[in-house]
UniProtKB/Swiss-Prot annotation:
Gene Ontology BP terms: diaminopimelate biosynthetic process; lysine biosynthetic process; lysine biosynthetic process via diaminopimelate
The gene coding this protein: dapD
SUPFAM superfamilies: Trimeric LpxA-like enzymes (SSF51161)
EC numbers on record: 2.3.1.117
Oligomer status and interactors: Homotrimer.
Catalytic activity: (S)-2,3,4,5-tetrahydrodipicolinate + succinyl-CoA + H2O = (S)-2-succinylamino-6-oxoheptanedioate + CoA
Keyword field: Acyltransferase, Amino-acid biosynthesis, Cytoplasm, Diaminopimelate biosynthesis, Lysine biosynthesis, Repeat, Transferase
Subcellular location as annotated: Cytoplasm
Protein name, entry field: 2,3,4,5-tetrahydropyridine-2,6-dicarboxylate N-succinyltransferase
Chief localization: cytoplasm
Amino acid sequence: MSNLQAIIEAAFEKRAEITPKTVDAETRAAIEEVIEGLDSGKYRVAEKIAGEWVTHQWLKKAVLLSFRINDNQIIDGAETKYYDKVALKFADYTEERFTEEGFRVVPSATVRKGAYISKNCVLMPSYVNIGAYVGEGTMVDTWATVGSCAQIGKNVHLSGGVGIGGVLEPLQANPTIIGDNCFIGARSEVVEGVIVEDGCVISMGVFIGQSTKIYDRETGEIHYGRVPAGSVVVSGSLPSKCGKYSLYCAVIVKKVDAKTLGKVGINELLRSIEE
C-alpha cells in the first residue's frame, strides 16, 4: 500500500469527523492529489488488469472524501452562477490547453473537476461527473450523462439522453463500465456497476441494472450485471413461471465480431433483427 493510499484509507475510516474546518493538511493534500490524478488520467477508479476489471476502492474513497473537505462556493458560468463543492474541469483552461489535450466541448457541456477526457472526444451538451474516465475518440451526445467514476472506453458513442450510472448516489461498490467500440442507443440506461464488454451495440431505450435479466436468445443463457462482448441488445420481456405476466428483460439477439462491427452500420445491425 502506498503512503497516499494509506492516508486516504485512514481518513475514510473517520470520515464522519472530517469537515472543511477540521481536515488536517496532510489529508487535504492527499485527497487533492488524487483528484488531480483522476483529472489528468494518471489514476483510474477501475482498469483492466490481466483481462479483468479491477476497482481501486481507495480512489473511490478519495472522491467521496473530497465532498467532506470543501464548502460550497460560487462558480461562474456563461449564463448563470452555480453553487457547489466541486470545481468545473475547464474553469482555468486556455485555448492552448484545449488544443493540446485535443478534444471538443460544445457550449453547455459540463464536466466536473476530477473527470478525465481523452483526445479526440466530442462532448455535446452533456454531463460528466467527478472520477469518470472517457476514452479516446468517444462521443458523448446531447443530454447524455456519465456518472461519477464511470469508465467509458475508446471509440464509444453514447447517444442522446443516455444515462451511465455513477457510484456516489446511491452508493455503489463498483463503477459502471462501457468497453471499447460500443454503441449505446438513445435514452438507454446502464447503471449499478454493470459491465458492457467491448464491441456491444445496445438499442435505444434499453435499461440494464444488476437485477436485469440479460437473455441470450440463441443459447437460452441469462446473464446478470454483464453484457458479453459483441452482443447486440434490445429491450424485451420474459414470461413469469406462472405464465400470468411478463417481466422486462434485455435480449441479446445476435453476436457480432469486431470485423463485422467495423463493416456494417449500427442501424443495419439493429434493423436486421429477425422477430
